[in-house]
Amino acid sequence: MIPDRIIEQGTLRTDGPRAAVEVRLPWYRALPGSCIAGAELTIDGKTAPAESLRWEMNGAEFTFDELRTNIDEWWFPTDSAVLSGDLDIEADAEHEVTVGLTLYIPYIIISDTETLHIDEKNTKTMKAVAA
């Protein structure tokens, strides 16, 4: 619902074959990890392989399979999470970064078997910093 603030400007990092960027919750209320259904990280038109994606929040790192059942870790609108994936990018260069998020909103029921889900994307250009 607030897609223009998903990517934190100036947070693109590269560490060998991996790239990472800080992201913010595009929703106005906190969500448990189980509501983070998926993400996509694309830099300069190249998308990180889904199996390489990792999500870090509250000091812990997760695969999206691990998040699927996680109700103990919560993502708050005031906190940044880190999305990383296998993308070998050049440090000290400008890159176009796109992050896509799919979130489930558990308290908005839209049918007998379904809750609201939102798909949001944000693109920003920023310089990568070596980790």
Curated annotation (Swiss-Prot):
Q: Which GO terms describe its molecular function?
A: lyase activity
Q: Which UniProt keywords apply?
A: Carbohydrate metabolism, Lyase
The protein's annotated catalytic reaction(s) are: 3''-dehydroisovitexin = 1,5-anhydro-D-erythro-hex-1-en-3-ulose + apigenin; 3''-dehydroisoorientin = 1,5-anhydro-D-erythro-hex-1-en-3-ulose + luteolin
Please indicate if the UniProt record lists Cell membrane as a keyword. Answer: no
UniProt temperature dependence: Optimum temperature is around 40 degrees Celsius.
Cofactors required = a divalent metal cation
User: Which InterPro entries would you find in this protein's record?
Assistant: CGDB
Using the UniProt record, name the top-level EC class of this enzyme in a single word: lyase
Q: What is its EC number?
A: 4.1.99.-
Q: What job does the chain carry out?
A: Carbon-carbon bond-cleaving enzyme which participates in the metabolism of C-glycosides. Acts on the C6-glycosylated compounds 3''-dehydroisovitexin (3''-oxo-isovitexin) and 3''-dehydroisoorientin (3''-oxo-homoorientin). Shows weak activity with 3'-dehydromangiferin (3'-oxo-mangiferin).
Subunit field text: Heterodimer composed of an alpha subunit (CarB) and a beta subunit (CarC).
Which protein is depicted?
Answer: C-glycoside deglycosidase beta subunit
